[in-house]
Swiss-Prot record:
One GO CC annotation: mitochondrial inner membrane
Record's subcellular location: Mitochondrion inner membrane
Highest taxon of the lineage: Eukaryota
Keyword Magnesium: no
GO biological process, one term: transmembrane transport
Protein name per Swiss-Prot or TrEMBL: Probable mitochondrial adenine nucleotide transporter BTL3
General function of this protein: Probable mitochondrial adenylate carrier that catalyzes the transport of ATP, ADP and AMP.
Membrane topology per record: Multi-pass membrane protein
Source organism (scientific name): Arabidopsis thaliana
Placement of Solcar repeats on the sequence: 129-212, 222-307, 336-421
Length: 428
């Protein structure tokens, strides 16, 4: 068995270390039968002879042969390092040849690559879990917000699909008389089935795109342009994946939709009568509307949030959150606080809805067209203006805003709250 001094000397020569400036911080007693290829040599590139010294305390771990085997006996030695001031500290590990840091008191023996692989698998698993929690936070936000504002959503659709021009109170009375209270939640299940995955993907895509843009730019904070680009990309991504459910919901709410037999019946009817691509009616105006809608919605919210967090009050709140940490309840862990989160969410939603509402009207009309009488998006827009003038493009804007204000406020609040509860790690 080789002595430690001989092993260190050979290791120094093999590592081409500077004797005047570097020192070996670990070693192994090895039997001759154990090949050197199975050992990852540990050295400290940051510890010099002048500034560090070995502690008198060293930890030893002895590995014995298994019964009935002839595996070599070897002994690992872990040496800790002290600063030049003489205070003893335990070593936190040293950089091995495999490129990552070993744990304190450990020596890498033929398992460097395996440990690296285990760490990679662990990181991938943690990333997948974080993504799942992120998606659930967005989905739960959509379910809560849509259920709360389902009656307003129903009235908005009545204005768009039927071209209602009457008094809002008269519309409420008619729905209550003909369909009862449950009529205000008509189509809410399919609405949740549509909006839950939509908002889930939308929120997650925005945070992901924003984080990637931040990494590419190398800035400390996301710029307003990056926020708008990330929001637009998130809107397009969610629209491409979720438009079919939105089309089915619109058909169910339209006159005669009750006879189709629910979501499955409406889906089967559209496939049989108009083909699969009928589920993507209004795709172009949907993409055209969702790109600016997502840009405005997420951009405005993030701009307001960033502006507040740079104020003295915002900085003080962040500092307080950092000091208290997990001792704060979930509401107090919201960076903006409950009320400001609701307010900024409502403002962002109102700005987004007002900016893109005409595209929404055109898209709904396209979804209602039969295959034989289908018009292009431009032709549909022209027809709407011819029949009711430019104000027709904003038909139902008031009930829509009444629906969007609480919806956006609740949605953003629940989303931020669930991220705290589920301990979602930020992408940016």
């Amino acid at each position: 068995m080789r002595g430690l001094d001989r092993w260190i000397a050979e290791a120094i020569r093999s590592e081409s270390l500077d004797h005047n400036g570097q020192i070996i911080c670990g070693g192994l007693f090895l039997e001759e039968s154990l090949p050197s290829s199975s050992v990852s040599f540990l050295s400290s590139k940051d510890c010099s002879v002048n500034s560090c010294r070995f502690s008198q305390k060293s930890s030893f771990l002895k590995f014995r042969r298994r019964n009935g085997t002839r595996e070599p006996l070897f002994l690992s030695v872990s040496l800790s390092i002290n600063e030049s001031n003489g205070e003893e500290e335990e070593g936190e590990g040293y950089n091995g040849q495999n490129g990552f840091k070993s744990e304190k008191g450990s020596v890498l023996i033929g398992g460097g690559q395996e440990s690296k692989e285990k760490r990679r698998v662990k990181e991938n698993g943690a990333g997948a879990l974080n993504t799942t929690k992120h998606l659930w936070a967005g989905a739960f936000a959509a379910m809560v917000s849509r259920t709360c504002i389902a009656p307003l959503e129903r009235m908005k659709l009545e204005y768009i699909v039927r071209g209602e021009q009457g008094n809002l109170l008269e519309l409420i009375q008619r729905i209550a008389t003909n369909e009862g209270i449950r009529g205000f939640w008509k189509g809410n299940l399919v609405n949740i089935l549509r909006t839950a995955p939509f908002k889930s993907i939308n929120f997650y895509a925005y945070d992901t795109y924003r984080g990637q843009l931040l990494k590419l730019s190398g800035n400390e904070e996301t710029t307003n342009f990056e926020r708008f680009v990330a929001g637009a990309a998130a809107g397009v991504t969610a629209s491409l994946l979720c438009l079919p459910l939105d089309t089915i919901r619109t058909v169910m709410v339209a006159p005669g939709g009750e006879a189709l037999g629910g979501v499955v019946g409406a889906f089967r009817h559209m496939i049989q009568t108009e083909g699969f691509f009928s589920l993507y009616k209004g795709l172009v105006p949907s993409l055209v509307s969702m790109a600016p809608s997502g840009a405005v919605f997420y951009g405005v919210y993030d701009i307001l949030k960033s502006a507040y967090l740079h104020t003295p009050e915002g900085k003080k709140r962040l500092e307080h959150m950092k000091q208290e940490g997990e001792e704060l309840n979930a509401f107090d862990q919201l960076e903006l606080g409950p009320m400001r989160t609701l307010l900024y969410g409502a403002i962002a939603g109102a700005c987004s809805e007002a900016a893109t509402y005409p595209f929404e009207v055109v898209r709904r009309r396209l979804q209602m067209q039969s295959h034989a009488k289908r018009l292009s998006a431009v032709a549909t827009c022209v027809k709407i203006i011819e029949q009711g003038g430019v104000p027709a493009l904003y038909a139902g804007l008031i009930p829509s805003l009444l629906q969007v204000l609480p919806s956006a406020a609740i949605s953003y609040f629940v989303y931020e709250f669930m991220k705290v509860v589920l301990k979602v790690e930020s992408s940016a």
